[in-house]
């Protein structure tokens, strides 16, 4: 009788160990997937704009403005077949990795000097597999709509649409898990991964704008230049052309962490570099 009880206890122990092992395995797999999604960085998501389509996993995504609704229609084309995915997009640029698509939806109110004014603004995640929308954040009151310019799966980057197209204001970092928005109050156009930082530029404005480095979550902003009209990353350096308001320019560079700024040319008329 005692042996049977011991055998039963051993069997129960083995079952518990196996259950714990399976639990740890599934937890580890989930964590690995999340880490991999984040480690792909900003290159995992493609930016699609109303004037430039983009290809992700064999599908071409494009946008077209609907004058009647004051919104964009988002299309997907593959193997010669084109279909409308969304007709409620208010953002002039969106991002997708082929699984999810991020955009803002809002009701247009009126036009202004620096862009349209909207109400009922919402940041939305669209699941391309289930074709369902999920509202992540609802914004209060009237205001400008954000264009989405980048995403790494954990953080999403966007800025207020203006009349300049690629030039956007009040750059924001969205924590997708916590659904929190951090506004930096700076202009923006592009985002790019540089080592463990994010390089933000505002080169979409005709007069240029700030170039700066941030942590992925938007913290510790470091200004590289207050008015850069061209920015590129090559090898161990960030190269940028900065300008004055009377259109003198010079080409400069700095280390990938924003240190050791160096002018490569003297100030001159025209665009340096």
Predicted regions and their residues:
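Residue position within the beta-strands of beta-propeller blades
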Residues: 60-64, 102-105, 156-160, 199-202, ...
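Sec-dependent signal peptide cleavage junction
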Residues: 24-40
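Short loop/turn segments that connect beta-strands within beta-propeller blades
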Residues: 77-81, 127-131, 174-179, 215-219, ...
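Structural motif
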Residues: 68-75, 109-124, 164-173, 206-213, ...
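Bacterial N-terminal signal peptides that target proteins for export
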Residues: 3-16
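Bacterial N-terminal signal peptides
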Residues: 15-27
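Beta-propeller fold detector
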Residues: 83-88, 134-138, 182-186, 222-226, ...
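Repeated scaffold domains used in trafficking and secretory/extracellular systems
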Residues: 45-55, 89-98, 141-152, 185-195, ...
């Amino acid at each position: 009788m005692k042996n049977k009880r011991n055998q039963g206890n051993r069997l129960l122990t083995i079952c518990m160990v196996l259950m714990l092992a399976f639990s740890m395995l599934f937890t580890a797999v989930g964590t690995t997937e999340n880490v991999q999604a984040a480690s792909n960085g900003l290159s995992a998501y493609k930016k699609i704009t109303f004037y430039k389509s983009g290809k992700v996993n064999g599908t071409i995504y494009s946008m077209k403005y609907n004058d009647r609704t004051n919104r964009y229609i988002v299309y997907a084309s593959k193997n010669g077949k084109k279909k409308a995915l969304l007709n409620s997009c208010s953002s002039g640029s969106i991002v997708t990795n082929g699984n999810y698509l991020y955009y803002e939806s809002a009701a247009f109110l009126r036009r202004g000097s620096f862009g349209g004014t909207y109400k009922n603004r919402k940041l939305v995640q669209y699941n391309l597999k289930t074709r369902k929308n999920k509202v992540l954040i609802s914004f209060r009151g009237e205001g400008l709509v954000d264009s989405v310019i980048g995403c790494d799966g954990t953080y999403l980057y966007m800025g207020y649409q203006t009349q300049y197209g690629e030039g956007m204001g009040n750059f924001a970092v969205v924590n997708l898990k916590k659904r929190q928005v951090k506004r930096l109050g700076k202009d923006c156009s592009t985002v790019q991964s540089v080592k463990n930082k994010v390089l933000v530029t505002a080169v979409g404005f005709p007069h240029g704008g700030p170039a700066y480095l941030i942590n992925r979550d938007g913290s510790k902003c470091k200004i590289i230049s207050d008015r850069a009209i061209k920015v590129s990353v090559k090898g161990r350096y960030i190269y940028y052309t900065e300008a004055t308001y009377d259109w003198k320019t010079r080409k400069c560079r700095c280390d990938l962490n924003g240190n050791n700024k160096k002018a490569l040319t003297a100030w001159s008329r025209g665009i340096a570099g």
